[in-house]
Amino acid sequence: MTTSFWRIATDARTYEADDLSGAGAKITGGRWNEVGVAIVYAASSRALACLETVVHLNSGGLPLNRYLVEIEVPDEVLASAEVATPGNLPVGWDAEPAGRVSISFGSQWAQSQRTALLLVPSVIVPEETNLLINPAHPDAKGIKARKVRKWLYDPRMIRKA
């Protein structure tokens, strides 16, 4: 059996939206990883995936080349995931913009190779869960991704300045 997680991603020149190599985050860094560390970000629901991406959009227009991607995680891999909660994360994990605390935490997790998955709280809605996938971990090979459909943001989500 598998459990589904979700991401909204784009086809880039060097990788597709359903790529699980962590190439995008490796190039840009993110809340939970420094530049050079590959991690795949996903959300526990489609709505959270939308929210996690829309906060990065500005009034310059809505991106058009996005896809809803389903990530299927084998239940045995999910059962061995490391779980971080607001109560066991270091103070400052939720700083905005992302700071050293969360970036170091996630990067150290990925480099340690302890688990293929790290469940973390959403900064936007801490009661909700995001999933980090370490593509370098051997258990990540059983995780599958597929483009479900084109993703279009509702224009009401972005206010023009």
Swiss-Prot record:
Mutagenesis or variant effect for S45A: No change in toxicity
Entry annotated with the keyword Lyase: no
Source domain of life: Bacteria
Keyword Protein transport: no
Stated consequence of mutating H56A: No longer toxic
Keywords annotated in UniProt: ADP-ribosylation, Glycosyltransferase, NAD, Nucleotidyltransferase, Toxin-antitoxin system, Transferase
GO molecular function, one term: nucleotidyltransferase activity
One family name in Pfam for this protein: RES
Post-translational note: Consumes NAD(+) and auto-ADP-ribosylates on the tryptic fragment Ala-47-Arg-66 in vitro. Also auto-ADP-ribosylates using NADP(+).
Enzyme Commission no: 2.4.2.-
Summary of subunit composition and partner proteins: Homodimer, forms heterotetrameric ParS(2)-ParT(2) complexes.
Job description of the protein: Toxic component of a type II toxin-antitoxin (TA) system. Expression in E.coli inhibits cell growth; bacteriostasis is neutralized by expression of cognate antitoxin ParS. ADP-ribosylates E.coli ribose-phosphate pyrophosphokinase (RPPK, prs) using NAD(+) in vitro; ADP-ribosylates RPPK on 'Lys-182' and 'Ser-202'. Cannot use NADP(+). Also auto-ADP-ribosylates in vitro; in the presence of RPPK auto-ADP-ribosylation decreases.
UniProt free text on domains: Forms salt bridges between the 2 toxin molecules mediated by Glu-127 Glu-128 on one subunit and Arg-46 Arg-149 on the other.
Family (UniProt): Belongs to the MbcT/ParT/Res family.
Protein name: Prs ADP-ribosylating toxin
Biological classification of the source: Bacteria, Pseudomonadati, Pseudomonadota, Alphaproteobacteria, Sphingomonadales
Encoding gene per record: parT
